A protein has these predicted regions:
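Short, conserved beta-strand segments of beta-strand-rich sandwich/propeller modules, principally
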Residues: 428-430
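Bacterial Sec-dependent N-terminal signal peptides
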Residues: 1-19
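Mature catalytic domains of secreted/periplasmic carbohydrate-active enzymes
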Residues: 18-362, 367-394, 398-400, 406-421, ...
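Short, Lys/Arg-enriched, disordered terminal segments
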Residues: 1-3, 453-460
Length: 460
């Protein structure tokens, strides 16, 4: 790794690591731990894989589910090499087919020819995640187009019992994922979901797991499936104003500066056009460069990245998807070399979220003078979010080797914010905070040169 040995001059009137009062709301311990994960995988693999559709109807024969070479160790091994921290599995999608032998549905792997009806994909993945040091998450669609009780009060108990099975038999769960889709069941009726019951099951059996839906309660949908968060991205949100399937969710997707609850955003996006595997999309896998841009636009905008990898009919991650993930991991590692690291004992550069710089009443400016010009195209900031999210707006002034200045204005920071720009040889830069809920606190400041697979600047 090329190592810079320059000195940094920090010009600011500031207080370092002084204890300050939180600005509420603040994250719980499990929400804080979840934010540190940043990047993990979604595994869409179920009946739809074999029927070549995105949404099944619940009328599919269990005999259709018969992977020829299912290997959860392969999934976990690739995810680990890709730098992911965990995997979330679609245990039951809208068609109702369950990937484990549940006592509460007859539509499951127990009725399939795979392993003569003795298989359990959830068990296999749980063991693989443990082997490779990954966390396990569960996606369990509340909508069920197969179950005869769907559309009645009894179904809520069925769903809760399936939750209990999944939450008590497969080890620690880090995230429980509720899909917002709610359509008709086999009897033509829709279900009124008992969300308080569903939430209570997770809190009872897996208290350290965060729960995802449009409206939380712990983490929320970012509002699109295209792989990006927004320039303004608050973790606080008016949670009591939204609900799963909320029709005016677009009005709340950015979060709110005056939000009442801490519910951080998650970006979900697929490596292919579809969520499930389709053979005609083998040549449409997102490139490593595209994935890196998605990473910056999600993790770099105060959100976590949930990247979907569709498993194919063999029960394996396809070679094209694996190759792209490995390429993404390689250029991400090369790009995330902090050009400011090791140059100061200042809390801004120690890599810890527990220490921070605090702006004074007289000066809200950080200036970094570089003794040697460096090629830079990204500046990253972090707030110590355990004390709340504070910054609502700021601007970065770049000064290149010729003395030419450029000012970039931006919105929120939160857990992590990456400001990208056309590569330039920087002589210095400064950050001015123009809006904040309380005293500005910055725990980390880094600079990068993001590159493409062609070893060229990523941002042109």
């Amino acid at each position: 790794m090329f190592r810079f040995t320059l000195l940094l001059t920090i010009l600011s009137t500031s207080i370092f690591a002084q204890k300050v009062s939180p600005v509420y709301p603040i994250p719980s311990a499990k929400q804080l731990a979840w934010s540190e994960l940043e990047y993990y995988g979604f595994i869409h693999f179920n009946m739809n894989t074999f029927t070549n559709v995105e949404w099944g109807e619940g009328k599919e024969s269990p005999s259709s589910f018969n992977p020829s070479a299912l290997d959860c160790n392969q999934w976990a091994r690739i995810a680990k090499k890709a730098g992911m921290k965990g995997l979330i599995l679609t245990v039951k999608h809208h068609d109702g087919f369950a990937l484990y032998p549940s006592k509460y549905t007859t539509h499951s792997v127990a009725k399939s020819p795979w392993k003569n009806g003795k298989g359990d994909v959830v068990k296999d993945l749980s063991e693989a995640c443990k082997k490779y040091g990954l966390k396990l998450g569960i996606y369990l669609s509340p909508w069920d187009r197969f179950h005869p009780d769907y559309g009645t009060d009894k179904y809520n108990q069925v769903y809760a019992k399936m939750q209990e099975e999944l939450l008590t038999n497969y080890g620690p769960i880090f995230e429980f994922w509720y899909d917002g889709a709610n359509g008709e069941g086999p009897n033509g009726r829709k279900q009124v979901y008992d969300w308080p019951l569903f939430h209570s099951m997770v809190n009872k059996y897996q208290p350290n797991a965060v729960q995802f839906s449009d409206a939380g309660p712990d983490i929320r949908w970012v509002g699109n499936e295209r792989g990006y968060a927004y320039d303004t991205m608050w973790s606080p949100i008016l949670r009591d104003k939204i609900y799963p399937g909320c029709l005016d969710f677009d009005n709340y997707r950015n979060g709110q500066e005056n939000g009442t609850h801490w519910v951080s955003p998650e970006v979900d996006v697929s490596i292919r056009p579809g969520w499930y595997y389709h053979p005609d999309q083998d040549d449409k896998v997102k490139t490593p460069d595209s994935l890196l841009k998605i990473y910056v636009a999600s993790v770099g905008r105060n959100a976590n990245l949930l990247l979907n990898i569709p498993v194919d009919t063999r029960g394996l991650i396809h070679e094209n998807d694996s190759a792209s993930l490995m390429g993404f991991a390689a250029i991400r590692a090369k790009s995330l070399v902090n050009l400011l690291k090791g140059n100061s004992v200042d809390p801004l550069f120690d890599g810890k979220n527990s220490t921070y710089w605090m702006a004074s009443e007289k000066n809200n400016l950080i200036k970094v003078d570089l003794n040697f010009v460096q090629k830079v195209n990204t500046i990253m900031l972090q707030e110590p979010i355990a004390l709340g999210q504070r910054v609502s707006s700021f601007e970065v002034e770049l000064v290149d080797e010729t003395g030419i200045k450029e000012v970039i204005k931006s919105g929120t920071i939160g857990h992590k914010r990456m400001i990208t720009f056309k590569e330039r040889k920087l002589k210095s830069f400064q950050i001015r905070f123009t809006g904040s809920r309380g005293p500005v606190l910055i725990s980390n400041l880094e600079a990068y040169r993001f590159i493409s697979t062609r070893n060229e600047p990523l941002f042109q």
